[in-house]
A protein has these predicted regions:
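Residues in the recognition helix of alpha-helical DNA-binding motifs
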Residues: 3, 10-14, 137-140
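Short coil turns linking two alpha-helices in DNA-binding domains
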Residues: 7-10, 33
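Long, low-complexity, charged/polar intrinsically disordered regions in eukaryotic proteins
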Residues: 35-100
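Short Lys/Arg-enriched helix C-cap and helix-to-coil transition segments
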Residues: 2, 19-39, 152-154
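Basic nucleic-acid-binding interfaces
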Residues: 55-63, 113-117, 122-124
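Intrinsically disordered, low-complexity regulatory segments enriched in Ser/Thr/Pro
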Residues: 89-118
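Short, compact, well-ordered microdomains
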Residues: 115-160
């Protein structure tokens, strides 16, 4: 430092940073979470911009294993079934601790179409229609920002948005 006439901070600023691993073969869990979060944000933004069945499907794929809560506060997650050809079947497997339920894609689409017709607050899941599994679809549509719900229900579902 006496040789260069620079301060200690200046000398260290020119040295390469050695504390981090760049372009590692395996990414950290935090990096994976950040990547998933960005993908989910992008899919939801696209769905809000262009509310189509295809964009809904892409959002559904992105939110697999996301911790949702029903309007009554019961936690659940879903996964998509994988078909024989290795692609996703359009069937959601709802994972509720002890029980697993299957939810058809047609039910999700029906609730989605009904949500587009509703402009005011959706007070309860059944307001979207008499649809099988609507209590699980309701928090998903709310999380995607497609419906508004009462504040009391929002608190039970965890204010995730």
């Amino acid at each position: 430092m006496k040789l260069t006439g620079l301060s200690r901070a200046s000398v260290h600023s020119y040295l390469p940073y050695t504390k981090g691993i760049y372009n590692a073969a395996e990414i950290s869990l935090n990096a994976e979470r950040c990547r998933t979060y960005k993908i989910r944000q992008e899919k939801v933004r696209l769905l809000k911009e262009i509310p189509s069945e295809e964009n809904l499907w892409q959002s559904i794929i992105a939110f697999q294993d996301y911790p949702f809560k029903t309007a009554t506060g019961l936690p659940f997650r879903y996964k998509l079934k994988i078909g024989k050809n290795g692609e996703y079947n359009r069937e959601l497997l709802i994972d509720r601790r002890e029980k697993s339920k299957s939810l058809a894609w047609s039910s999700v689409v029906l609730a989605f179409e009904n949500s587009k017709k509703v402009s005011e607050e959706v007070k309860k899941p059944k307001a979207l229609g008499d649809i099988r599994g609507v209590s699980y679809i309701y928090p998903i549509l709310w999380r995607f920002g497609l419906i508004r719900v009462p504040e009391a229900i929002e608190k039970k579902m965890g204010k995730q948005r």
